[in-house]
Amino acid sequence: ARLLARNGYKKMTVDDLAREVGIGKGSIYLHFSSKEEIALSHIDRLVDRVKERLRSIAERDAPLEKRLHDMLIERVMIRFDNVQHYSKSLNEILGYLRPQLLERRKRYFGEEAKILAMVIAEAQASGLFAKGDALDLAQTLIVATNSLLPYSLSAIELGDREEVTDRTHKTANLLIDGLRVR
């Protein structure tokens, strides 16, 4: 991540990465076929952390609305916080990885939606949320909060954590209000 921040994606080489972590270039190629694969692996690990955190919140002993609210906030803010050190090169990285990333995003978001759907279904069963397809509703929440993810923000917005946090809270509140039984 430091190397990305310093050199940008285009200028970063596998040689640079090997030097940075103190191993031979060959050792890197034992695990990864290219720097693209290394970057995608980094993104995969970030999404794994997001899903772990969502599961942890889903299992908490807290009101259902609070759990869902916190899950929506976390899925945005974990990503925001993780790209801060290379936010200037984020567009460059995404430009190079776009085709591969688009394939993975569908899977990432589908997996996150399944976790959200568990809480939505529980809230529906308790009479708190209106009936409906919990997974479809979860996918709608994912799509609605995706506009707050780092790749959707401008460089200026990426620098303002307070603004992104505030906007994410407002969005989560609005979305959850739309799920309530009337």
State the predicted function of each range.
Residues 87-91, 102, 124-171, 182:
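Hydrophobic/aromatic-rich alpha-helical bundle segments in the mid-to-C-terminal region
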Residues 119, 174-178:
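C-terminal alpha-helix
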Residues 3-37, 41, 45:
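Helix-turn-helix
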Residues 70, 74-115, 135-136:
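Short secondary-structure transition hinges
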Residues 41, 45, 55-82, 137-141, ...:
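Hydrophobic alpha-helical connector segments
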Residues 6-10, 61, 82, 126:
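Short coil/turn segments at alpha/beta junctions that flank glycine-rich nucleotide-binding fingerprints
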